Amino acid sequence: MSFSGEMANGKTDVANSGFSSSPEDMSGAEEGKENSSGIEVEASDVSLSLTGDETGTTQAESRDTCSETSGEDKDSDSMDDTGHYSINDENRGNDQSHSEDEEEEEEEEEDEEEEEAVRHRKRAQRKRANRDQDSSDEERALEDWVLSEKTPLPRPRWRALRALRQRQMGSSTRFIYDACGARGFVQRFRLLHGLDGHSGCVNTLHFNQRGTWLASGSDDLKVVVWDWVRRKPVLEFESGHKSNVFQAKFLPNSGDSTLAMCARDGQVRVAELSATHCCKNTKRVAQHKGASHKLALERDSPCTFLSAGEDAVVFTIDLRQDRPASRLVVTKEKEKKVGLYTIYVNPANTYQFAVGGRDQFVRIYDQRKINENVNNGVLKKFCPHHLVTSEAKANITCLVYSHDGSELLASYNDEDIYLFNSSHSDGAEYIKRYKGHRNNATVKGVNFYGPRSEFVVSGSDCGHIFLWEKSSCQIVQFMDGDKGGVVNCLEPHPHLPVLATSGLDYDVKIWLPTAKEPTELNGLKEVIKKNKRERDEDSLHHTDLFDNHMLWFLMHHLRQRGQRRRRRDAGLGAGDADSDDSPSSSDSSDDDEDGPDRVQCIPS
């Protein structure tokens, strides 16, 4: 019995050793499971061998069943009375496996979401990079285009303090002359005031020789002579024209008593002004078969001037003759007439004059050598070489000689402004190029500014006024010049640092260098970029003249036409003093004068 009891106790100890172990002996749930199973088998074998019956097996199975049941009810990590951990190894393994699968799935989903987010970020970064690259490329291309053919600004030649000191000491007799051409003055231009008196777009401006009066002509068919300092009209009168007045100029050395005019109706008229500030009469002295945009004065002659028209004809007009107008030349290119928009007499040689119009060539004629059977009478022609064979049709809207006749400036429609040396041989390339503005919507003017033609000034379709330093081609001034959107006409004062401008607005603007600080050219880069982009788009798509902008012009002018008709019906047209009986126009027809009004920029 004692042996049996010991054996029984031994079985119990062995069994207990199979179901519990100290924490030091536990290395993990799986290891405990394997050890437990092995010990149970050994204890069962020992019990069978010692007792010789099946009692040990039954007891072992009973203990195993009880252990499994109690393991389901107890927490696998709970601690029993002996201080050991009791763990249900199989359930823990299943739970761990299921939990691991869920965690893996969650991790995979998170990884996929993270990868998708990364891909999205990369795509967005690539798009931003592409946009930035495109923008950067555009910026670089614009910078390269603007900076090409430019040179750094030279040091100013005129020093204000030194000039003032010399003037006080009496050693400088040309203070104003030098100051007018100073960059520091140009960079301080600011609007002084406007001159209000027209009811239509102002197309022409011209100072008299002394610079005291300013003449303006408009779509309202009126000409106003201003005392621009006092902001008052000296006189105003009906021009006698039947359509838009394009030019009105004081004839030099006439005592401001003679004003020459031309207009869209093709007429060239002369107004005689009295000392009592009234218009005696206006008379027609020539008639073009198309619109006449410009007149060219001889520097010292009060009686002679030239006119050019869209009919390709250049008239020379001598007011001393019974028949004032005589045809000087018909501009042709390979037997095809070239309509003219602009004409200018060389101030250093009044026999020579230059014309430009509906092709890309600047033509210079000499009145003493015109033989239309030889080179169509042309002395020489200039054109930027890249425009000679260009498919895009380039027109010259305006050209002017420099103060001494050595240079010739030409503004091209939807192109740039080019400077030529007038003494160069036939077909010579340009010497300077001025960029940034846009010349598309109207017959845009261009001019030199300064007593030595130190600067180039032009209007733009963006409504701004651009001033370039001639020598460096750098923009030194940039002003908002027209609320209507287009600046057409720019007239420098003959003696003072004053600039008069006009455009689609119904007023004349006077600019003086009164700003305290030089301009900072704010917004210039964006305006240049916009002008260049619009120009490139138009050149690609070859847009028609009648786009939205031009349709607005057309409607505007049609409204003005109705107003003029009503005014004429009310007896407010040209008075009895107007005379149209000039014999010089006997070979011309007026049949087209009553046709529908056209916008200034649209070819007739």
Curated annotation (Swiss-Prot):
Top-level taxon of origin: Eukaryota
SUPFAM superfamilies: WD40 repeat-like (SSF50978)
Annotated keywords: Cytoplasm, Nucleus, Repeat, WD repeat
Pfam families in alphabetical order: WD40
Example of a GO cellular component annotation carried by this entry: nucleus
Main subcellular localisation: nucleus
Residue ranges annotated as motif Nuclear export signal: 39-50
Acidic residues composition bias: residue spans: 100-116
Signal peptide interval: none
InterPro entries assigned to the protein according to its UniProt record, in alphabetical order: DCAF8, WD40/YVTN_repeat-like_dom_sf, WD40_repeat_dom_sf, WD40_rpt
Disordered: annotated span: 1-141, 564-604
The keyword Nucleus belongs to this UniProt entry's keyword annotation: yes
Localisation per UniProt entry: Nucleus; Cytoplasm
WD repeats: 197-236, 240-281, 287-327, 335-375, 391-430, 438-478, 482-522
Comp. bias regions, Basic residues: 119-129
Compositionally biased residues, Basic and acidic residues: 61-99, 130-141
Biased segments, Polar residues type: 14-24, 46-60
The keyword Zinc appears for this protein: no
PANTHER family listed in its UniProt record: DDB1- AND CUL4-ASSOCIATED FACTOR 8, WD REPEAT DOMAIN-CONTAINING FAMILY
Family per record: Belongs to the WD repeat DCAF8 family.
Identification of the protein by name: DDB1- and CUL4-associated factor 8
Organism: Xenopus tropicalis (Western clawed frog)
Gene that this sequence comes from: dcaf8
